[in-house]
Amino acid sequence: MAGGRVAHATLKGPSVVKEIFIGLTLGLVAGGMWKMHHWNEQRKTRSFYDMLEKGQISVVVEE
């Protein structure tokens, strides 16, 4: 039984440019999501203080 040669995929080392691109993309996506989260929190805080200033809400418990 003569064994034939099977073509296997040769493993290459990591591509530096590809790794930089993937890292940059993931960093920008994560940074954008973090920034959007903080904008949302800032909007909620500003809305709370605006309502407090207008007298629509109060932080004092009514008895």
Curated annotation (Swiss-Prot):
Location(s), subcellular: Mitochondrion inner membrane
Entry keyword set: Membrane, Mitochondrion, Mitochondrion inner membrane, Transmembrane, Transmembrane helix
Main location: mitochondrion
Annotated transmembrane regions: 16-34
Membrane among keywords: yes
Keyword Transmembrane: yes
A cellular-component GO term for this protein: mitochondrial inner membrane
InterPro entries with a match to the protein in the record: COX5C
Family under the similarity heading: Belongs to the cytochrome c oxidase subunit 5C family.
Physiological role: This protein is one of the nuclear-coded polypeptide chains of cytochrome c oxidase, the terminal oxidase in mitochondrial electron transport.
UniProt-recorded name of the protein: Cytochrome c oxidase subunit 5C
Gene source species: Hordeum vulgare
UniProt gene name: COX5C
